[in-house]
């Protein structure tokens, strides 16, 4: 029988990795200038401002808990944890306010949360009569790419999470323009790269996956998919049905490379904790691939 070859074998694990930790920056350090309203239904007495978060004013207590945890200098939290705490269904397609598909678990925070609110005299409100298009100057937005950043905003009354697209970005000044359908806590998030690297079984949360990877981590191309899957399942059935409905036999597939990790590169660490789906092109070290078998 002619054997089919798979170019790489990816081990899927779940392990939490840390996001950025903040040294309690002031609101002036995060957003040094007052927002400029481009479009919005505000009265002459109303002013759009940013201020330190006031979690005690949030009607949704879960939002208050999440914002407090993210802004805690002594707490390390990644986006996947934030999404789970806010009960964001990552099995469903998530889109920005401009209807662009996005996987927020592949982002990390660049700032802590700050409150975007309307001030009228001495009164602060988190409610708005329609969308507000505004320009914000964000220090962390300097020298970033527009396509890689979003604003994550949470409605403190309903708990609804929005991923707000950046419409304009001045990399020199950090000035961003975006449209908000609601007000409340907001932070800047940036897409993180998904990379391939040498396997690290010691970092895997799943012991079965770790044990299987340890057995194969030093083996070069030529092992079967069965060699890997056998240690992960309690069945001897070699037939597997893929998501597209196709049924394959594990013994028909042989590795054309050594085992590698696909991981999320976050700050100075790696994370395997991803929700949703990912379309990716995977690059391998040329020395690890058996090109003659392809």
Predicted regions, residues:
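Short proline/glycine- and polar residue-rich coil/turn motifs
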Residues: 126, 169-172
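Hydrophobic core
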Residues: 13-18
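Feature for mature exported/ectodomain regions
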Residues: 2-4, 20-112, 118, 123-148, ...
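C-terminal beta-strand-rich structural cap/linker in extracellular carbohydrate-active enzymes
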Residues: 176-197
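Beta-strand signatures of extracellular beta-sandwich domains
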Residues: 150-152
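Surface-exposed loop/edge segments in extracytoplasmic proteins
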Residues: 158-166
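Solvent-exposed strand-loop boundary residues in beta-sheet-rich modules
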Residues: 155-158, 192
